[in-house]
From Swiss-Prot:
Name assigned to this protein: tRNA dimethylallyltransferase
EC number(s) from the headed UniProt entry: 2.5.1.75
Site (described: Interaction with substrate tRNA): T101, R124
HAMAP family, sorted: IPP_trans
């Protein structure tokens, strides 16, 4: 394929969304959100969603497409993102994936195989019950025994993906990492320009702390209250960082100060994991948004796009 694609990745709060808009305006681009939580309606503040009035006329895709009770997966993202890349190229514009969900983005440019297995609801129920009784770390230990490669890549708290991996093994007799590897054998699909934003850790952590404070000021607590009133307490989306802590506060289990502390701490940890993931990919060209302005970085990307006949 000769379809063009620009990707901008990096940890949370590093400036990806603002850079994506600046680049898109210069090159007649459209943005595809590479964030696993911004797909959900009504969850604006806690996901740091770019709101319509902030998009400066740049089309954004895969934002506000699902109700919070609906399931989203890397396989669905892969399918929709590839469809959008094709359509945007056909319109003579350039798709720009902007986000920090590493596996989602890799699934688009590295042809991961997400074979649509049908699963045994009884087996899934047993796994879910075991997780309730013994915690997700117990299932993660099970995964380590049958598929250490997947266990290393899937976080011990990511219950949905742990269960998925155990189901694949139960159903096929092969570890899910086998299907990941099988899907990566094909040649690259796109003409790719791949960029990452980073900055000094102390500065990034300061920005994360300030962002969380702003989320509280903007009304994160009221946003979570509305979601609870709409009946979404048990939805997977409400387990997202920034939401589950406020739910605990509203239920009287922790104080507001404790909730804010946990959100800041866990967001910093999340940013560290994001950087670790992306730094493993040698295709990414890195910019330091703590040392260079987004305008300067935009100019460099536009220059490189011109050299590579993207414009």
């Amino acid at each position: 394929m000769s379809e063009k694609l620009i990707i901008i990745v990096g940890p949370t709060a590093v400036g990806k969304s603002a850079l994506g808009i600046k680049v898109a305006k210069k090159i007649n681009g459209e943005i595809i959100s590479g964030d696993s939580m911004q797909v959900y309606k009504y969850m604006d503040i806690g996901t740091a969603k770019v709101l319509p009035e902030e998009r400066e006329g740049v089309p954004h895709h895969l934002i506000d497409i699902l109700e919070p009770f609906q399931k989203y997966s890397v396989a669905l993202f892969q399918k929709e993102a590839r469809r959008l890349i094709k359509e945007i190229n056909e319109r003579g514009k350039i798709p720009i994936i902007v986000g920090g969900t590493g596996l989602y983005i890799r699934s688009v440019i590295d042809p991961y195989d997400f074979t649509d297995f049908s699963f045994d609801p009884v087996f899934r129920g047993k796994l879910e019950q075991a997780a309730k009784e013994k915690g997700s770390s117990y299932l993660h230990q099970m995964l380590e025994k049958i598929d250490p490669v997947a266990a290393q890549k899937i976080h011990s708290n990511d219950l949905r993906r742990i269960i998925r991996a155990l189901e694949v093994y139960e159903h096929t007799g092969k570890p899910i990492s086998y299907y990941w590897e099988r899907g990566k054998q094909s040649k690259p699909q796109y003409r790719l320009l791949y960029y990452g934003l980073t900055m000094d850790r102390a500065l990034l952590y300061q920005r994360i702390n300030e962002r969380v404070d702003k989320m509280i000021e903007k009304g994160l607590i009221a946003e979570v209250k509305r979601l609870l009133q709409m009946g979404f307490k048990e939805s997977t989306a409400m387990q997202a960082l920034g939401y589950k802590e406020i739910v605990q506060y509203l239920e009287g289990k922790i104080t507001l100060d404790e909730a804010i502390y946990l959100i800041k701490r866990d967001t910093r940890r999340f940013a560290k994991r994001q950087l670790t993931w992306f730094r493993r990919d040698p295709r990414i060209k890195w910019f330091d948004s703590g040392k260079e302005s987004l305008e300067k970085i935009t100019e460099k990307i536009i220059t490189e796009a011109g050299v590579n006949n993207f414009l």
